[in-house]
A protein has these predicted regions:
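Active-site acidic carboxylates
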Residues: 1-65, 159-170
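Glycine-centered short loops/turns at secondary-structure junctions
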Residues: 24-27, 92, 118
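Internal catalytic-core helix/loop-beta-alpha segment
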Residues: 59-101
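Short acidic-hydrophobic, aromatic-tinged amphipathic segments that line or gate anion-handling sites
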Residues: 71, 148-158
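A short glycine-rich beta-strand->turn/loop micro-motif centered on a GG-aromatic cluster
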Residues: 97-100, 119-133
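Short glycine/serine/threonine-rich phosphate/pyrophosphate-binding segments
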Residues: 103-110
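Active-site-proximal loop->helix
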Residues: 131-145
Length: 170
């Protein structure tokens, strides 16, 4: 959230609610992030001279719970050079709910790669963000028409609550 300013703060509460609903439905929750020092791999932040470890910290309000996977990556996609695809195959995932920073970078790259691996993707509009609203909206439009269902957080939470009720009744 250090690179996306005010837009990032607006996504905190919807993302917190989404995480709670996913956990209640018994779905695996997986985080991706980076370390500031990635053995010489340079990022835009590093080129600007502003890269710090704090830039990549997961905010306390959204912190992983014990047992939730945190995938450390060196590039925009959570899949590139990481064990993410192996883990998703192991847990039998068929669909992914994707959110985070930035819509035009990491969210887009991970969504395109997930689509290429055959996953059905949902990108949650209020739980993604970018440096500019224009960039955010254009990328959501493009992702929706090619690689994912872009949905509102309330719709996704409603589906997750229904799934939780179904699993509880079973």
């Amino acid at each position: 959230s250090g690179s996306c300013g005010e837009h990032a703060w607006k996504a905190l509460e919807p993302t917190r609610a989404l995480l709670a609903a996913a956990r209640k439905a018994g779905l695996p929750v997986i985080y991706t992030t980076r370390h500031a020092d990635t053995d010489g791999v340079r990022s835009t932040h590093r080129k600007m001279g502003s890269e710090t470890e704090e830039l990549y910290h997961i905010k306390a309000e959204l912190a992983p719970e014990p047992g939730e996977l945190v995938v450390y990556k060196e590039r925009a996609s959570g899949f590139f050079g990481t064990p993410l695809i192996a883990h998703l195959r192991k847990v039998g995932a068929e669909s992914l709910i994707i959110c985070g920073e930035s819509t035009s970078g990491c969210v887009r790259a991970s969504t395109v790669d997930a689509f290429s691996y055959g996953f059905h993707n949902v990108v949650v509009e209020e739980c993604t963000y970018d440096r500019s609203l224009l960039s955010h909206k254009v990328n959501l439009f493009d992702l929706h028409h090619k690689y994912a269902d872009v949905m509102h957080v309330d719709e996704v939470i409603s589906h997750l609550e229904s799934l939780a009720r179904t699993r509880t009744a079973a």
